[in-house]
């Protein structure tokens, strides 16, 4: 049977790998399986999803920020479409969008990756490696 390359990948690579994880860890929930399969990428996306509202517009870091030094991330996470699969209905703005997207003026959160991104946060905050910050400074309670 002759299939298009994408179908070959789905049928003979992706599905068998996914089924191997399901067989090896039958009691894991979705988050557990995705953590095993995608590692730090999934954990970062999950954390971002859990700490932003659905209507958030997130300034997403460049591929250089995600892959610098001994980063735990792979290059895929810097791809806007890849990240949106996990973060939808949130919107992402990447540095390439500056001057091209009307969402640039609506950014509500800044993704911090490998210690980069603090320059977009308009208030002082203690530095950390990976996380998400709102553009508006949270009120002290």
Regions found by a protein language model. Name each.
Residues 3-44:
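Membrane-proximal, lumen/periplasm-facing interface regions of secretory-pathway glyco-
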Residues 6-8, 98-141:
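Aromatic/acidic, Gly/Pro-rich catalytic loop(s) in extracytoplasmic/lumenal soluble domains
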Residues 38-39, 48-50, 54-106, 124-125:
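Extracytoplasmic
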Residues 6-18, 77, 81-89, 93, ...:
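Generic hydrophobic, helix-prone segments enriched in Leu/Val/Ile
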